[in-house]
């Protein structure tokens, strides 16, 4: 699980998305941080294996130019900045970030190396490639799954697909329980998204559109907050967005009905009345409670419930410090608690 924020509009994007990530970093990120914007047809990017505050101290990311951008904080992984998002396509035109995991698709051990071998043989490059005693690829090699997805989108675009259809093709060829965003230099006025089951909310403002993993972090002027549809891809512009459902989705995402929400809300409240919980613990509570599909959207439901509790004034967000990726580094962990 990771955390994402994005913006497209008339204002400078970087300061806006930095503040949105700051408000959610403790839920399930802070080990790695990365940001990308587009300005005058060029990608601007910074990333490292550190929390947001450290990246702010090391770089001037709030000064990155452009009125369109995205930022990413991720959970623990290899101790290497190369595993931080965004990933850049081999042609240098696409920046890609994602949130999620293999989930129900993790058991398929063949598709990943098949896609990697095809792309490698065609000359696509993986900046996250590390060598060691890994079991993911032949020869003990390993690449980040989002790097693979990024280069595969590049491949499908090189073979004639538009970016939305390329996103769908990459999602459906090798399934993952994820959501992702992409910036493309040849379409500098929009953010492309793909969503399987992990959450991506949008909020409308007079000057543009916000996007985030959780609605809890939107600025006060956000309205008409909406969860983007599952098993779909589309694009977000400053004043509207488009959605295209996958023709042959690799899984069925369970629907979030009012009854499901009520039952899950009650379960979370009951659990929090007994003990404080972090985001992962709430996810594990909710996942088996969502019927009607093989790919439950538990993280979206988790954040919807926490957002409602926050709006009701019932939620307390406690913080604790935990070790980061690099020696001596730290990250902040959020813990959900109810007012007694």
What are these model-predicted stretches?
Residues 1-340:
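Conserved short alpha-helical segments that host acidic/polar catalytic motifs at enzyme active sites
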């Amino acid at each position: 699980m990771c955390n994402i924020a994005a913006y497209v509009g008339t204002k400078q994007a970087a300061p806006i998305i930095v503040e949105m990530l700051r408000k959610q970093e403790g839920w399930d990120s802070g080990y790695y941080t990365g940001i990308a914007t587009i300005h005058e047809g060029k990608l601007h990017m910074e990333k490292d294996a550190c929390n947001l505050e450290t990246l702010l101290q090391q770089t001037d990311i709030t000064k990155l130019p452009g009125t369109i951008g995205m930022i990413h904080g991720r959970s623990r992984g290899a101790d290497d900045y190369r595993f931080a998002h965004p990933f850049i396509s081999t042609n240098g035109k696409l920046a890609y970030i994602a949130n999620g995991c293999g989930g129900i698709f993790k058991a398929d051990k063949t598709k990943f190396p098949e896609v990697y071998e095809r792309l490698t043989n065609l000359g696509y490059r993986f900046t996250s490639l590390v060598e060691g005693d890994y079991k993911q690829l032949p020869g003990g090699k390993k690449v980040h799954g989002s790097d693979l997805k990024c280069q595969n989108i590049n491949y499908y675009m090189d073979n004639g697909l538009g970016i939305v259809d390329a996103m769908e093709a990459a999602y459906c060829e090798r399934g993952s329980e994820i959501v992702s965003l992409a910036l493309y230099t040849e379409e500098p006025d929009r953010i492309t998204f793909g969503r399987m089951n992990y959450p991506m909310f949008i909020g409308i403002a007079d000057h543009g559109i916000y996007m985030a993993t959780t609605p809890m972090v939107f600025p006060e002027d956000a309205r008409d907050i909406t969860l983007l549809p599952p098993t779909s891809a589309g694009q977000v512009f400053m004043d509207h967005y488009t959605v295209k459902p996958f023709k042959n989705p690799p899984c069925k995402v369970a629907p979030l009905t009012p009854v499901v929400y009520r039952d899950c809300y009650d379960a979370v409240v009951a659990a929090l009345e007994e003990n404080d919980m972090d985001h992962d613990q709430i996810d594990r509570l909710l996942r088996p409670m969502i019927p009607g599909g093989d790919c439950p959207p538990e993280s979206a439901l988790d954040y919807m419930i926490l957002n409602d509790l926050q709006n009701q004034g019932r939620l307390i967000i406690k913080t604790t410090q935990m070790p980061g990726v690099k020696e001596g580094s730290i990250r902040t962990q959020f813990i959900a608690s109810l007012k007694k």
